[in-house]
């Protein structure tokens, strides 16, 4: 993924609800980039350091850590008569039940989305571009990731390895570009499970591509506010057909599968990792081999 260039006035993605914070320090202990500091007895998120991985949100027993929501922004778009396109992350098949998946396109159209397509279409383009990049530089080590939190982690914790990041945009951005190219004036909204996508959308390099980022929970909140019940919607299809293999992209090693590369654990030159501890371990291994005598692609 392309390196993040954040705007000077970066909107915080993760923040502390001060009234709920109870001095337990759990978020401070688990933050992989030490972006949480104690101030006046409160665990405060340092926006410039935060990679929006969401770990602190998960561990906080008081629910004092939260993420910035964009559903109000999308609701305003819809109420002003906008007919945005929706890029839906392929992991919706995990969040929604099988019968809900069949009715989801109709529910989204009832909300006001004019074009509904899976982000997996962008995943195919990202995978092919990544494969081309690797083939053009076979003698170098590569870090291949579409995860904005992982990219930010490299920039914060292993800046010496930043040059190994494959300069390819994520599926969200690739898909957003395709949708904007088709209709430049149309708003594009992304929906998925990842909080870090809210950060990625505001990087300078991605300006004007994604107009709002929703989590699946925010999507459900829009359905609630508009009194739309998925179980009462008709079955319907998305506006575009997805290359089947591209739906594997969110899985560990999914980029490899989509690009047609080996995911065999015995493959000497490809390491597929997930979770910041595994990512850190893989980065440490690369950093310990500055001459790249053991060239690897970390995915």
Feature names for model-found ranges:
Residues 1-25, 254-275:
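A broadly conserved sequence feature marking short terminus-proximal activation segments
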Residues 68-299:
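Iron-sulfur-associated redox domains of electron-transfer enzymes in respiratory
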Residues 2-6, 13-17, 22-46, 51, ...:
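Iron-sulfur cluster-binding cysteine motifs and their immediate structural context
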